[in-house]
Amino acid sequence: MKKLWQNCHIATMQNGQYSYIEDAAIVTEGHLIHWIGKQQQLPADTYSETVDLNGAWVTPGFIDCHTHSVFGGNRSVEFEKRLQGVSYAEIAASGGGIASTVRATREASEEQLLNSALKRIRCMQQDGVTTIEIKSGYGLNYENERKMLRVIRQIGEKLPMTVKSTCLAAHALPPEYKDQSDAYIEHICTEMLPKLHAEGLVDAVDAFCEHLAFSPAQVERVFKTAQSLGLPVKLHAEQLSSLGGSSLAARYHALSADHLEYMTEDDVKAMAESGTVAVLLPGAFYLLRETQYPPIESLIKHGVRIALSSDLNPGTSPALSLRLMLNMGSTLFRLTPEQALAGITIHAAQALGLEQTHGSLEQGKVADFVAWDIEHPSEIVYWLGGDLPKRVVQHGQEVIF
């Protein structure tokens, strides 16, 4: 049956622009958009329900395309230590940092991981998020990576959201492989990835290319394995140094390369040629008090699509608000509100390979949208906090919180 959503204004975000339709209406049928346009051009039809949006602005549902939402414990004590002047290296040397999250995640049951993640993600839903990507990477062995990926699948079953899973086994070196990074990469490629993929738990494969993680050559082995399994790839690249990770990602036609503070002009050109999306993570940039900015002007000049994401994780971006990331993206990286909104809608969809079905409001696409009590879409980026969404609609059905 068809449902009519009327008396609204729409920022469709087609082609990465507001692409306004004022005095508009949307007709949904099942989980899809059946018709969208000016209300005065609405075709005569019969509707099972009519919803008056009372002049609200409507945007596509938000897409958080890079998160680590499933983890055990938190690192608030480390946050306090860093503020007292203790370095990340000192924290890591004392058993903190990612190692502490790996321990807590390994110790947690599936049920504990699921319940804690659901609390976090429900906060994000209320901010307008209708699609989320979640990475593994705190298990670092087959049993616990599998546990994380199973939890991610369960989140997609429990919540009215689109949930994509990414295997990030190549996130850090587990303690049992100390000083044996090549052996761990071999284990990922010959044991973990094939088994996890065979169980239907993996939508994409990611890795962390950095001096403190894995080299470009090691990452390439992971990419080749993913490619042989028919899985798309993504990459944490150029966050702390320039290793050419983003160019490597481009060579493998990665969906995205993420962070990118230290990428070069050649990296930008390679990503532009491959169509790889640049995912910027202002939350981590802010919390780590970084000073090296991603090359925004170069990315825009060469036509690289820019997405924004929360990078929700317990160590460097405990961010539960994607709307806050919008403001940070504009304030820190000087993106316009229009560019920032494109970064969590159509460009974020492209970073997940979902642009044909998600990310903009068009006939035939999935009916994920948010109605806002605002006078212009730029207000979504402008306001810090507050309860702006009037309605969150997922697959044509209003989400009740």
Curated annotation (Swiss-Prot):
Annotated residues for binding of Zn(2+): 66, 68, 236, 311
Key word rRNA-binding present: no
Molecular-function annotations in GO: imidazolonepropionase activity; iron ion binding; zinc ion binding
Residues where Fe(3+) binds: 66, 68, 236, 311
Keywords: Cytoplasm, Histidine metabolism, Hydrolase, Iron, Metal-binding, Zinc
Family annotation (InterPro entries): Amidohydro-rel (IPR006680), HutI (IPR005920), Metal-dep_hydrolase_composite (IPR011059), Metal_Hydrolase (IPR032466)
CDD domains for the chain: Imidazolone-5PH
Gene3D superfamilies: Metal-dependent hydrolases (3.20.20.140), Urease, subunit C, domain 1 (2.30.40.10)
GO cellular component: cytoplasm
Cofactor(s) needed: Zn(2+); Fe(3+)
EC id: 3.5.2.7
Catalysed reactions, semicolon-separated: 4-imidazolone-5-propanoate + H2O = N-formimidoyl-L-glutamate
Pathway(s) of this molecule: Amino-acid degradation; L-histidine degradation into L-glutamate; N-formimidoyl-L-glutamate from L-histidine: step 3/3
Function: Catalyzes the hydrolytic cleavage of the carbon-nitrogen bond in imidazolone-5-propanoate to yield N-formimidoyl-L-glutamate. It is the third step in the universal histidine degradation pathway.
UniProt cross-references to PANTHER family, sorted A to Z: IMIDAZOLONEPROPIONASE (PTHR42752), IMIDAZOLONEPROPIONASE-RELATED (PTHR42752:SF1)
This protein's name: Imidazolonepropionase
Species in which this protein is naturally found: Acinetobacter baumannii (strain AB307-0294)
Encoding gene, per UniProt annotation: hutI
